[in-house]
Structures are given as C-alpha cells and as structure tokens.
Amino acid sequence: MKILHIIRSVNPEGGGPIEGVLQLSSIKRAQGHSVDILSLDSPDCESVRACELTVHAMGPGLGLYGYSNKLKPWLDAHAQDYDAFIINGIWQYHSFAAHSVLKSKNLPYYLFTHGMMDPWFKYQYPLKHLKKWLYWPWGE
C-alpha cells in the first residue's frame, strides 16, 4: 500500500504531529508499505532534507494558516498515486486543501487530530475556541 501523510511541517520543533507520523511510518514501512509526506515546508528546509521519508514540500506556507497555492494542484495531480491518505492536524490550510481535493475525487482519508480537539483547549483558550468553532463548518 502507498500511504501519503499530509502535514503542515516536518520540522520537529513543531511538536508531536511529525513525531507521530515518523513513528507510524516506521511501522508501516517495516510491514512493507510505502510512505510519503506532503508538507507546507520550503523545499530547501533543513528538516525536509533530513527527513527519512520522501517529502513533497509545497511551501513555504504563508502565515499561521500556512496557505500555499502549490498544495492543491500537486495533490490533485498525484492523488491517484496513493492508496491511503492521512491528514495530520486541523485548523490550517493543509487540512482544508486536502479535504477539498480528496472529497472532490471521492477518495476516503483519515484525519488524525493529534489532540487538537481536546476539551482542555476549549476552556484554556476560549477566544481561540470561538474562532475555531466558527471555522469548523466550512473549513474542516
């Protein structure tokens, strides 16, 4: 099986999502599967060069949201090359773009929130929660 992980960044300074991708990918590769990453990193980023997996870097993503006009066309052109898609993280452009392309092609995918829906955030950051609550119906 050929798996594509879609994530904002492969930079380990971004926290746990990339570590989760690498750990899961290690297991999947040991089982004989092929794993690539689609990210919003700049292609010349050190983290992209150092990554043990093939990284299709479509960035740099702009601002906190990470918009890149390269991500959707790349995914649209290459989606048929993969058997499974895992969107890692929410609330940013990579998840919106991946959902949009994959839904238009009627391709199923997995969404791994990496704790981003934890109720703790709702109470710890009420204004961010309100913003995300308004974004959810059309963005995710």
Model-derived segments and their meaning:
Residues 12, 63, 92-94:
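Short glycine-rich, flexible loops that bind phosphorylated cofactors or substrates
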Residues 41, 58-62, 102, 113:
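Residues at the C-termini of beta-strands that transition into short coil/loop
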Residues 50-76, 84-87, 123-132:
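A short, charged, and often flexible helix/loop element on the N-terminal side
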Residues 77-78, 139:
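Structural alpha-helical scaffold elements that stabilize or flank donor/cofactor-binding regions
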Residues 84-119, 136:
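An aromatic- and histidine-rich active-site surface loop
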